[in-house]
Each structure stands twice: as C-alpha cells, then as structure tokens.
C-alpha cells in the first residue's frame, strides 16, 4: 500500500465504486524497494489513510500480513503466531463462510494468499484470485520478484488464478494505462468524500479528500525522480487491474 502511488489509487477506486465492489477487508505485507525491506506499519498506515479518506473505516478492516517470504515462513505455518498470521487467518475465515466464490485481488506480492492456501487448502474451491503481476513473456516484474516462492506455490495448487500482466513498454498490459501529473492536477483536486477533520499524508501536509492527496502523491513522485528528467506520465498498474 505504501509503494509509490498506484496502490493508493487502486484502493480508492475500489472503495469509490461500492455499487460494483463489496470490499470487506484488506491485508498488507512488506516488500523490498531494491535495497531494504519496507516497514509493515508504513503499509498499514497508508492503507488506513486511504480508507479514512474514502470514509470507509467503519466497514473495511485492515490486517497486517507477512514481513518475510513464503519460503521463509512456510515451515512455521502451524505456529499460532507465525509471521503474517493475522492476515492469513482473516483470509481463511472469510473464504470459509463465503456463500459465493470470494474474490481475492492482490496488487502486490502473493505471500499472504499462498500462506492461507498452505494452512487451509480446503478454501481453494471457495476463492478466485485476480493478481496484478508478471511481465510475461519477459522477466523482471516487481510483485513477482518480491516473492517468487509464493507465486510458484499458488501455481501448483488448483486455485482459480488469473493474472493481470504489467507488460512493460507494451500496449497489451497495465503499463499502458498511464496518467500525467498535469492531468492529475487538473482533474483530481477535491474529488472524493470531504472530511471534516483532515488527515496527515505520508509526505506531510493535511488533506480533506483523496483527490487532494492524489495530487500530493504525484507531486512528490515527480520530485523524487526529477534528476532522471521527471517522467511525463506514470502507469497506474494496480488501478488498471482493479478496473
């Protein structure tokens, strides 16, 4: 949830379209930014920030998940407090009672879901996984590379598993769904529910709407990459997978 800015827009899109999506909960996990592991609390805080901006904190729960890889955790799966147990147990509990096939929409690495299938394989017929990931036919995709062992395990099960691919540089993947900061600055200010009490953004500042926070995320993204020439547009990988 705390990676760059497409995660936040995917979550907001889901929560804004309640006529189409019945969002019951979210799980988060850590990723690596290429240098070091990210902080699970920062992912949780950013997810909660978006939920609050969309005024859904009373109906959507967030659960902390894995901080390691599937391979590193799997042997501890029978321990009551294994790494990621809160998120994994939530997935299992919801899948067990779902009257229809429960859709899991991971827009990051697959660790939490793979652990849930390992711990309770009986939920496999009850779920449908729609994952934003893979750069097939080519290698090198962030969500896949963050935990290839989780992907491998899921592929070896009989889970209903769909991939929404990135396909860098191609028109046939989510990399083609791009937006410029100029478009964001024109369209997004004030969009979404308006909060009476503003919240603090991850880069500082206070915000009463997701639209204003969206502008801030893009402005900080532009600042972060200014030495590389500030890319004119940014793919919204995760939001494209949701849509």
Describe the role of every protein-language-model region.
Residues 1-243:
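N-terminal acidic, glycine/proline-rich low-complexity segments
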């Amino acid at each position: 949830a705390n990676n760059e800015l497409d995660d936040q827009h995917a979550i907001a899109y889901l929560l804004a379209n309640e006529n189409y999506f019945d969002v019951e909960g979210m799980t988060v996990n850590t990723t690596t930014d290429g240098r070091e592991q990210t902080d699970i609390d920062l992912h949780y805080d950013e997810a909660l920030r978006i939920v609050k901006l969309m005024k859904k904190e009373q109906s959507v729960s967030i659960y902390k998940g894995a901080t390691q890889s599937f391979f590193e955790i799997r042997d501890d799966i029978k321990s009551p407090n294994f790494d990621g147990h809160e998120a994994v147990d939530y997935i299992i509990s919801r899948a067990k009672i779902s009257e229809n096939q429960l859709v899991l929409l991971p827009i990051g690495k697959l660790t939490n879901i793979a652990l849930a299938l390992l711990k309770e394989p009986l939920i496999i017929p009850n779920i449908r996984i729609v994952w934003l990931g893979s750069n097939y036919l080519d290698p090198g995709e962030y969500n896949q590379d963050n935990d290839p062992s989780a992907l491998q395990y899921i592929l070896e099960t009989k889970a209903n598993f769909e991939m929404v691919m990135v396909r860098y540089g191609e028109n046939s993947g989510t990399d083609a769904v791009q937006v410029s900061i100029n478009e964001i600055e024109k369209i997004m200010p004030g969009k979404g529910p308006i909060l009476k009490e503003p919240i603090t953004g991850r880069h500082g500042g206070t915000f009463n709407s997701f639209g204003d926070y969206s502008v801030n995320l893009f402005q900080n993204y532009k600042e972060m990459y200014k030495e590389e020439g500030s890319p004119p547009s940014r793919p919204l990988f995760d939001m494209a997978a949701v849509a």
